[in-house]
A protein has these predicted regions:
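Active-site neighborhoods and metal-handling regions in enzymes and metal-associated proteins
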Residues: 2-429
């Protein structure tokens, strides 16, 4: 790979050959992927009656450009005279390399000053203000851009248009999810190997973290919903599983401290008590989300019955999504079955802290759409990826299971461990 020149006082050279995966792999997004994504966005903009979109959110930039350098991507609608351009503030050289180098689908050039932005837009064919991501851009930044673009008219919102495009994954993206699931499996093996009586949740989480980091996890789980942030290893031993948290999910765990009040904490494994392990890995940005139960010694009959019931609810939700039911119908089926089993006041939490979903879409973010919840009156699209996670909480702890699935033309494909790993793993007591 080439040496790239950068300006840092005197001219320096940096080695692009270091921008690889853990074993020297080229981890750039294929140029064909970037071309296809920009083409889909151009078609969607035309259908929505928008002339162009100016994208500057890091996640959406990665999806469109293959990197998350500081900058903006302008995409013109099909049939418009707007030419695509990737404007970069920092680092231009790295953005050029990450988007394919000389094979990059569109020009990668220095970002204009804000005082010249309208002139730059007009130079590439824009006659109207480009749409932007009102659902992601901070209010002050939105107002700042709107003020600079007012000579081109009002700025429209294209947030849900972008979200809709990313709901359907390409074949390449699905393979990223599968590899993420394979690494997630290895994380569970690490927890199995180090866990047992007396081990703290954080000790077990550290073992899983080591596997994930070695495989290339970058340290950040991205979420859409403000003010959510996520510790991607939630391990809750015994009664820790019943502790509520800010996180919009069934379980939160104790966390390590009040500022980190989600995930693994200082509680220890006790013989006979349920230990729930819910772990996320990102492979080149793509999420896998999986949950399994552990116990030192034998799990009591009542808890085991609850676990088997959660697996039955999971199967009913997966079957519903696979045959094309609306996500709201999958929710009604799953939550209705839970109510019939006697879990209405314990499903996905305990009052008043119950979450009201049974599955969430995943991709480059943990909390994508659609969701298995009321009012999501649409299907999971073919190519959509979703984590299905029925769980119940009691004062004795949390019980549940979770795998990540993709909808295919033939039904639902499990992208994580699925049947390869049982519902319960027992450590020696």
């Amino acid at each position: 790979m080439p040496l790239c020149s950068v300006l840092g006082g005197p001219f320096m050279a940096w080695d692009a050959g270091r921008l690889t995966g853990p074993d020297g792999e080229d981890w750039r997004v294929p140029v064909s992927e970037l071309e296809a994504r920009r083409g889909r966005l151009a078609a969607a903009l035309a259908e929505a009656g928008l002339e162009s979109a100016l994208i500057d959110d890091p996640v959406e930039l990665y999806w469109l450009t293959g990197g998350r350098q500081s900058g903006m991507m302008l995409v013109g609608a099909d049939g418009s005279d707007v030419s695509n351009v990737h404007w970069v503030r920092k680092s231009l050289d790295r953005a050029h390399f990450e988007s394919g180098g000389d094979d990059s689908p569109d020009p990668v050039v220095a970002q204009p000053r804000m005082s010249r932005l309208v002139d730059a837009l007009r130079a590439v064919g824009a006659t109207r203000a480009p749409a932007m991501l009102a659902g992601k851009v901070p209010h002050d930044r939105w107002e700042f851009f709107a003020g600079h673009l007012d000579s081109l008219g009002a700025t429209a919102d294209c947030t849900h248009l972008m979200f809709g495009l990313r709901e359907t994954k390409s074949a390449w993206e699905l393979e990223m999810h599968r590899e993420s699931g394979r690494i997630n499996h290895a994380m569970f093996e690490a927890v199995r190997d180090v866990g047992g009586v007396g081990r703290t949740e954080l000790e077990m989480a550290a073992a899983a973290d080591e596997v994930s980091r070695a495989a290339g996890f970058g340290g950040r789980i991205r979420m859409r919903r403000w003010p959510m942030d996520c510790d991607r290893v939630v391990i809750a031993a015994g009664r820790s599983g019943a502790i509520p948290s800010y996180f919009d999910s069934a379980i939160g765990g104790t966390g390590a401290s009040p500022i980190s009040s989600l995930g693994a904490g200082h509680s220890k494994v006790v013989a006979g008590e349920p230990v729930i392990v819910d772990m996320v890995h990102l492979h080149r940005g793509y999420v896998s989300d999986c949950t399994r139960m552990f116990c030192a010694g034998e799990l009591d009959f009542e808890s085991m019955t609850r676990l088997e019931d959660m697996a039955e609810i999971r199967d009913s939700v997966v079957a519903s999504l696979g045959r094309g039911d609306y996500c709201s119908e999958a929710w009604r089926i799953g939550s209705g079955k839970a109510a019939e089993m006697g879990y209405a006041d314990h499903l996905m939490g305990m009052p008043p802290n119950q979450a009201v979903f049974l599955g969430h879409s995943v991709g480059l973010e943990l909390d994508e759409t659609p969701v298995v919840a009321d009012r999501f009156d649409r299907e999971l699209p073919v190519g959509g990826t979703m984590a299905i996670e029925p769980k119940v909480l009691y004062d004795t702890g949390a019980i549940g299971t979770e795998d990540t699935f993709a909808r295919t033309s033939d039904g639902m494909e499990c992208l994580t461990m699925g049947a390869k790993w049982g519902l319960l793993t027992e450590w020696d007591a």
